């Protein structure tokens, strides 16, 4: 599915750089003080990161996120945008652990990115989709201190959407370009070697093949293709979680 992508995170190069990048992407940085009040970011501090304890970016439930994203995919291909938004709120909250204000804002940005991408070329707006996803990744950076460059993460996100569209239309029957594009996004997000993320990318590509077949066969809700699609997404997230904790 477009975002979700839910593939995410990079490395923070410096505290001043983090604040500057956040402001460049349209959000003001700051710090959370011990007494719970927020300091301004004018002194070059690290982006304001909520005290979740262990990084929630690396402590999600593969079963929960996989099942939620499968439902998001169904809503996307049925163009049920209200349902897509409601489910995206749950995905963003469950997968990324942002506070509720950022969660709702992030889900809205994901919705708009998908709506801009959904029409077939030349009616689609890849640049607009990238702008929305850049702002989404900037929210993620404010929460978790990563990815290092939201604009780069957004480029990689929308790139795999592009590769999937080509694959979906049968212009390229090989899944390797899609696996490569997903691996690159995951590697950038988590700061790991691509080889460690390929199992997660391969399961995700398998899930996409199944949902594409489901679309071709009429998008029936009782289709036997939906359970294995959900299972492939769960396996993808399980492989991703295993890789980032290896």
Predicted ranges, named:
Residues 36-47:
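Hydrophobic membrane-insertion alpha-helices, especially the h-region
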Residues 57, 95-102, 142-145:
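Flexible helix-coil transition and linker loops at the boundaries of alpha-helical arrays
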Residues 61-69:
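Generic helix N-cap/helix-start motif at coil->alpha-helix transitions
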Residues 76, 117-121:
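Hydrophobic/aromatic side-chain positions at a characteristic register within alpha-helices
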Residues 89-114:
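Short, charge-rich amphipathic alpha-helical segments embedded
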Residues 133-217:
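Extended amphipathic alpha-helical interaction segments
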Residues 220-246:
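A cross-kingdom marker for long, charged
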């Amino acid at each position: 599915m477009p975002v979700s992508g839910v593939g995410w995170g990079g490395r923070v190069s410096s505290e001043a750089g983090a604040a500057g990048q956040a402001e460049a992407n349209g959000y003001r940085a700051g710090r959370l003080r011990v007494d719970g009040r927020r300091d301004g970011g004018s002194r070059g501090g690290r982006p304001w990161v909520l005290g979740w304890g262990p990084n929630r970016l690396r402590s999600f439930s593969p079963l929960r996120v996989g099942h939620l994203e499968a439902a998001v995919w169904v809503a996307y291909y049925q163009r049920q945008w209200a349902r897509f938004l409601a489910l995206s709120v749950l995905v963003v909250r469950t997968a990324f652990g942002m506070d509720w204000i950022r969660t709702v804002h992030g889900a809205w940005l994901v919705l708009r990115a998908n709506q801009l991408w959904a029409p077939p070329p030349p009616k689609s707006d890849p640049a607009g989709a990238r702008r929305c996803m850049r702002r989404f990744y900037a929210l993620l950076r404010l929460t978790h201190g990563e990815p290092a460059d939201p604009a780069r993460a957004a480029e990689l996100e929308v790139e795999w959407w592009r590769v999937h569209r080509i694959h979906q239309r049968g212009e390229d029957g090989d899944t390797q370009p899609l696996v490569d594009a997903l691996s690159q996004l995951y590697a950038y997000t988590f700061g790991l070697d691509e080889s460690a993320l390929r199992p997660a990318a391969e399961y995700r590509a398998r899930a996409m093949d199944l949902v594409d077949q489901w679309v071709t066969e009429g998008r029936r809700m009782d289709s036997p293709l939906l359970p294995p699609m959900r299972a492939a997404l769960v396996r993808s997230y399980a492989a991703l979680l295993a890789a980032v904790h290896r």
